[in-house]
């Protein structure tokens, strides 16, 4: 092959470049849309694959599908580098018109399509938009873009856009669906003093059209006056702020003026030298006003307003002054309240500042101790009156009965022995242990040892057996007795004497409470007996008598004698008072007192052998029969009589060392090595007990020989006839013979007539006792002497606590 000539090389190169350019022609990416205004024109728009000069490279040809129509050409224009728009003119567009479209790039057909204008309608944009202000409203108007004869004139709807000129995002859209191209906008709906712009566009909804382009915009300035309703909240808020500012400014101004001007004015009330006058002594020392009664302090702002505006606050101040006066005066207090009180400030007196006065003065009246006066009254009379007693009886039947009983006992005891005086003080109550039985004697050498208690029937009541050491026994502390009771003080003189069984049986409760002995001494248990600490405070004379007997250490003894022992005791004392004058009267008193003592020893639970009419008699000095079983000596009171053991073989029946049947251990004065020594307290109490024992001793002894009075009688058919003798019957007329022991002198006669035959059935019947329940009385002797009535020792024994029948003397 040959080579090309150098002259042909340039033309070949140009042909290759042209072919390459032809093969790389432009392409249409997509046909955007074709719309018709439905009047005279239609618009088509498409996008090229690369930037293209639409008017130089492209052309659009369109032709109505009709044989007689011409082929028309449209030169496109560039909207953008790659977007081309072509406007096609059409005459008398109708709904049935259809056009054929062809896009050419030179001789190359890019695309072809058909287009029906009635189905692709895009109305024209409204024109001539204007804004008018009418009565606080804005009227927007525009013109319809279609003539009246066009089909779209009545098919258009509008959309109005109102926005702030400076802020396009703040806008409002109004949809106008009616035919009239107008819009009314209320000025209040828009912000005042703001510039707004409006624009409008149209659409033919029935033709399936799209929104037209926005019309040219119009602007206006929104300025209007707000109505009163809208201006009122703002005005109120502004007014409140102004008023608050004025008040604060006035307050601080007044405070500043007060500090700089008002406080500088001299005022005597601010002076520290103020004398306080103290009055109204009826106010209590501790009676301070409560918070509710204290007058409220006036706040500072009120004080300032009062000084500045006195006329406005005058009425309120008067009410406060009246209320403060009422609180200060207070209610009237009765004279029964405390006499000493503190003093309260009622007035202030202004003094010159030169004078120095104390800022406060308190006047108090000291309380007078009334206890010193009571002590002085007690020194004058040992029996305090009921008025001075803090716990006296209440006025009423109980108080009257207590005072009558007091006067009766004082009269009876005074008639018996005028040397008793008025002393009725009780023994000290503060001692830790009080002896249960007090031994009275003239000196420490004559103190008698206490007896031992033995059961009446050891087989039937083994728990009642007592074991006692040879020394003196220690007993429980006596229950506390209120010593401030006037009736009890009156009884204390007589209660200091040994009590007889008749007096003990006058109160059934007394017999029950006599069972409270020392826990160290074994005795029969009494489950129904309440503890001594739980006993109520004595209020009646019977209860006080019971408490006194408990203090004296009386042993328990079951008794169920009827009430009325007080009357029997009073009768006995009256009869005993005549013993000093004549023998028969003394014997009658002795027998009545014996019947009283016999009646007090009745036991309701006794059964078995029936006693005879003489078994319930009073046998104070009768020794036990040799043939009879050893009785259990359960003595109650010995009335201060000195008793010696009988010098007979019967003493061997009652050995003192037998643990099964302990009995009395008779000894002679000065021979008992186990005799306990009396303490100073017991020696002091013995002097007082001598006074009480002298009453009974004078009633039961003969004034001629100093021996006991005896009653001789005989029993006939169960009845005891008593014959009283004017003397003791054993040594009357024989003054030279020394007095023998009462026990020896009162041994039972050989005839077998017991001493208790002198006890009449009448006296037993008066106490409500039957012959079947007449117990025997036994006596427990104690060493001592009976040389004179002024030195009569007092021996108090213990009662058996068993449920069997007991007898006391």
From Swiss-Prot:
One Pfam entry name: fn3
Maturation and modification: On IL4 binding, phosphorylated on tyrosine residues in the cytoplasmic domain.
SUPFAM superfamilies for this protein: Fibronectin type III
Keywords (A to Z) from UniProt: Cell membrane, Disulfide bond, Glycoprotein, Membrane, Phosphoprotein, Receptor, Secreted, Signal, Transmembrane, Transmembrane helix
Topology within the bilayer: Single-pass type I membrane protein
Extent of motif WSXWS motif: 211-215
Renumbered ranges of motif ITIM motif: 695-700
List of residues that carry Phosphoserine: 163
All residue ranges annotated as the Fibronectin type-III domain in the record: 125-222
PROSITE patterns recorded: FN3, HEMATOPO_REC_S_F1
Origin superkingdom: Eukaryota
Subcellular localization(s) per the UniProt record: Cell membrane
Cytoplasmic side: 256-809
Sequence ranges on the Extracellular membrane side: 26-231
Cystine crosslinks: 34-44, 74-86
Biased composition (Polar residues): 447-468
Motif, Box 1 motif: chain positions: 261-269
Cellular component aspect of the GO annotation: external side of plasma membrane; extracellular region
Residue(s) carrying Phosphotyrosine: 488, 566, 590, 618
Domain notes: The WSXWS motif appears to be necessary for proper protein folding and thereby efficient intracellular transport and cell-surface receptor binding.
Assembly and binders: The functional IL4 receptor is formed by initial binding of IL4 to IL4R. Subsequent recruitment to the complex of the common gamma chain, in immune cells, creates a type I receptor and, in non-immune cells, of IL13RA1 forms a type II receptor. IL4R can also interact with the IL13/IL13RA1 complex to form a similar type II receptor. Interacts with PIK3C3. Interacts with the SH2-containing phosphatases, PTPN6/SHIP1, PTPN11/SHIP2 and INPP5D/SHIP. Interacts with JAK1 through a Box 1-containing region; inhibited by SOCS5. Interacts with SOCS5; inhibits IL4 signaling. Interacts with JAK3.
General function of this protein: Receptor for both interleukin 4 and interleukin 13. Couples to the JAK1/2/3-STAT6 pathway. The IL4 response is involved in promoting Th2 differentiation. The IL4/IL13 responses are involved in regulating IgE production and, chemokine and mucus production at sites of allergic inflammation. In certain cell types, can signal through activation of insulin receptor substrates, IRS1/IRS2.
Family: Belongs to the type I cytokine receptor family. Type 4 subfamily.
Name of the protein in its database record: Interleukin-4 receptor subunit alpha
